[in-house]
């Protein structure tokens, strides 16, 4: 993507990444896909281990939910999940064009990282999560809030409201 994070329509450019959510049981890993058109979280999955399947299942969930065209670019960092043959094969089978950050350059995936910063600042760091199940519930509620109720500064709308304007 060469840091060109502007999308003119839904499902043109997605970014993906994994972050960890601390709980008393250990870390819960959260994989998300964010649409750069409206900043909505298209799909997300959680797991107690950071595996290739966590990422693959997130892509599958996004594919079930959204229309994927050959124009779609999916940007990630160079984590082992995103450089795996399984990831390459799945994105190719869906007609998704892969894009990756340059090695050692976190700014290339800034918009995926930005969502995790918002999630942790507004939600996760305010509570002490006791369990994986509690963390999953909190993440579910926050992502619903983020997509459907949280106003984006740039558009003055929620991600879903902004997306509906394109479809209308």
Predicted segments, located by residue:
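Basic, flexible linker segments flanking DNA-binding modules
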Residues: 1-9, 105, 160-167
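Mobile-element integrase/transposase regions
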Residues: 1-32, 56-57, 65, 69-72
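Conserved, non-catalytic sequence blocks in retroelement Pol enzymes and Pol-derived host proteins
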Residues: 5-7, 23-24, 78, 105-108, ...
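Active-site beta-loop-alpha junctions of metal-dependent nucleic acid enzymes
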Residues: 26, 45-67, 83
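Short, acidic, Ser/Thr-enriched surface-loop or helix-capping motifs
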Residues: 35-36
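Hydrophobic "anchor" residues
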Residues: 40-41
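RNase H-like two-metal-ion nuclease catalytic core shared by retroviral integrases
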Residues: 76-78, 84-85, 100-120, 136-139, ...
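C-terminal domain-tail junction helix/linker
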Residues: 92, 96, 118-168
């Amino acid at each position: 993507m060469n840091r060109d994070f502007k999308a003119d329509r839904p499902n043109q450019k997605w970014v993906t990444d994994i972050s960890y959510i601390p709980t008393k049981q250990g870390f819960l890993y959260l994989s998300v896909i964010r649409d750069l058109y409206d900043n909505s979280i298209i799909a997300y999955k959680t797991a107690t281990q950071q595996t290739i399947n966590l990422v693959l299942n997130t892509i599958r969930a996004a594919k079930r939910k959204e229309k994927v065209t050959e124009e779609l670019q999916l940007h990630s960092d160079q984590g082992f999940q995103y450089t795996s043959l399984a990831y390459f094969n799945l994105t190719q089978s869906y007609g998704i064009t892969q894009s990756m950050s340059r090695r050692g350059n976190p700014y290339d995936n800034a918009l995926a990282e930005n969502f995790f910063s918002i999630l942790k600042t507004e939600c996760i760091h305010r509570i002490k999560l006791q369990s994986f199940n509690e963390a999953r519930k909190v993440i579910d509620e926050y992502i619903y809030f983020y997509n459907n109720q949280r106003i984006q500064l740039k558009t003055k709308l929620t991600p879903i409201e902004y997306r509906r304007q394109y479809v209308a």
